[in-house]
Swiss-Prot record:
<comment type="similarity">
    <text>Belongs to the bacterial ribosomal protein bS16 family.</text>
</comment>
<dbReference type="GO" id="GO:0015935">
    <property type="term" value="C:small ribosomal subunit"/>
</dbReference>
<dbReference type="GO" id="GO:0005737">
    <property type="term" value="C:cytoplasm"/>
</dbReference>
<dbReference type="InterPro" id="IPR020592">
    <property type="entry name" value="Ribosomal_bS16_CS"/>
</dbReference>
<keyword id="KW-0689">Ribosomal protein</keyword>
<dbReference type="InterPro" id="IPR000307">
    <property type="entry name" value="Ribosomal_bS16"/>
</dbReference>
<dbReference type="Pfam" id="PF00886">
    <property type="entry name" value="Ribosomal_S16"/>
</dbReference>
<dbReference type="InterPro" id="IPR023803">
    <property type="entry name" value="Ribosomal_bS16_dom_sf"/>
</dbReference>
<protein>
    <recommendedName>
        <fullName>Small ribosomal subunit protein bS16</fullName>
    </recommendedName>
</protein>
<dbReference type="GO" id="GO:0006412">
    <property type="term" value="P:translation"/>
</dbReference>
<dbReference type="GO" id="GO:0003735">
    <property type="term" value="F:structural constituent of ribosome"/>
</dbReference>
<keyword id="KW-0687">Ribonucleoprotein</keyword>
Length: 122
């Protein structure tokens, strides 16, 4: 599978990245199939080869999260709606218990409203 990913280059603590198409099993800084752009996070400079990127995307290349973000900002792909964060099992159990208590409380209040108290004094 072809991946669109960032290839790091530059000096220590002054990294820049090339946007490349490469095989998903190759190393991050290995030899790419094609260079498709450039990104400098310090200056926010971005250069994209839009024709080549559209071609690779149409062929089924999968962008990484960082590349997807750059492509969304560049207008090459639509923004994706990311799923909500996965909550741990303990928090899910607590949420279920709290919801069950709320339902029971509401049911008890509804039952109390239905049965009026007998205040018939003669």
């Amino acid at each position: 599978m072809i991946k669109l990913r960032l290839k790091r280059f530059g000096k220590k603590r002054e990294a820049s990245f090339r946007l490349v198409a490469c095989n998903s099993t190759s190393r991050r800084d290995g030899r790419p199939l094609q260079e498709l752009g450039f990104y400098n996070p310090r200056t926010k400079e971005t250069r994209l080869d839009t024709e080549a990127l559209r071609l690779r995307l149409s062929q089924g290349a999968q962008p990484t999260d960082a590349v997807r973000s750059l492509l969304e900002k560049g207008g090459l792909i639509e923004k994706t709606v990311r799923p909500a964060e996965v909550v741990g099992k303990a928090k899910q159990a607590e949420a279920r218990k709290a919801a069950a208590k709320n339902v029971a409380k509401q049911a008890a209040e509804a039952k109390a409203e239905e049965t009026p108290a007998d205040n018939t004094e003669a």
